[in-house]
Amino acid sequence: MADNKSENTLSSDATEVRAQKLKLLREQIGEVYPAHFHRTMTNAELIAKYENLEPDVETQDVVTVAGRVYSSRNSGMFMDIHDARGKIQIFSHKDTTPEEARALLPMIDIGDIIGVTGSVRRTKRGELTINAQTITMLTKSLLPMPEKWHGLSDIELRYRKRHLDIMTNEDSKLRFQQRSKILSGIRRFMENDGFMEVETPMLQSVYGGATAEPFKTHHNTLKLDMYLRIAPELFLKRTLISGLTDKVFEVNRNFRNEGVSTRHNPEFTMMECYWAYADYEDIMDLVERLFESLALSIHGTTEFPFGDKTMSFKGPFKRVPMPDAVKEATGIDFRAIKTDEEARVAAKAAGFAVEKDWTWGECLAFIFEEKVESTLIQPSHVTHFPKDISPFAKEVPGEPRLVERFETYCNAWELGNAFSELNDPEEQRRRMVEQLEQAHARGEKEKQLDEEFLDAIDQGMPPAGGLGIGVDRLIMLLTNAPSIRDVILFPARRSKAD
């Protein structure tokens, strides 16, 4: 195997040393990157099986495990190897380990992936250990690992080289395991509640369902400009119209060609659903049940930490109409204000810089964002939105300037947006045409009317409640993550050259 002469001729540069060891290994053992290795159990399974093994007890049980080497002590006599779910100590000694296996030890570096067969014991100090009988090189790592206990200190590098971040940061690793569990939990909850999951187009010839700047591309064969979807709403409503199901949902990515922040990524995950014969109050109940279920699955309780706060996903959540919240915060009674001009005057008198063409509803929503949003720390539903900014929602009976819409807030973040969906085809067309004219006035000349959707709604859409949940923000809360980039495996970032 590796003689002293080979060791003594190795370079002092860490990367070069690994390359030289790889060359020696190829010469001495042949295949250094085998296609297959059979484990008898994972590290986690091993730990669970022998959790009651007493200290200083050695079994005759022989197991085979594999993992990445995270630490090596006493010239490889003690090594810790990790797989995705656990750590096991490997012990190699002349009394228990054949010479052929021990001869491989000088060639093993931190970061290499090895397979080990041996007997199970627990040391006097209580460490579950395998006495190595055979050691197999499975992957020779050509680059040193970052320092295990501190991980990557450069935040941008953590996002650029997420594989190293997860490799060296147990918090990051756990967070993405929890993300997977949350996504599964959303799907399981929705299916158990009778919803059918569908997939709607990511590439759309007409974008809609939200107000946002899309990413544009071109289909060469069809000779057609297309857009990455900004929302699945109109296709999900067409599915509801079809009668395929009365309860439909989708969990998938949306794309918006807009800014990047701690709460915004241009590619993000949404859960959107539509429930026939329900209204926005039914959807509020659904949100509360879903959030409580997810908190219990991750934390075992509805209360959990976020930063220096304790959040509670135990329903019912606080419910407050937007005009009432603004009146309480500022003293401005928007229900008593009759015209757009009066709304602008009242807003300016209270010190708010509003635009000269803003409507009553735009003034109300702006003041809410400025004065109320930041106070919504515990989960809250804000209801009764202005119709001006809610083109797809039904009017509140007796209050035609307001609609049956709510947004769910927590930690001052918007987590969800829901409506009693507009299903009057004539009113829907009028509002969509008005929205299109506003978009064109803003310079969004590519925005088009979705005639296929309007044709479908002419066929008749049942009354329904609709909901969109920002899954990434919800995961941020449930995993105590300060930035959306901490919960997206490979977030958007500037190129390395920038």
From Swiss-Prot:
Cellular localization per UniProt: Cytoplasm
Lineage, top ranks: Bacteria, Pseudomonadati, Pseudomonadota, Alphaproteobacteria, Hyphomicrobiales
Superkingdom of source: Bacteria
Needed co-factor(s): Mg(2+)
Name of protein: Lysine--tRNA ligase
GO cellular component, one term: cytosol
GO biological process, one term: lysyl-tRNA aminoacylation
Organism: Rhizobium johnstonii (strain DSM 114642 / LMG 32736 / 3841)
Top EC class for this record: ligase
EC number: 6.1.1.6
Chief location: cytoplasm
GO MF entries: ATP binding; lysine-tRNA ligase activity; magnesium ion binding; tRNA binding
Binding site for Mg(2+) 1: 407, 414
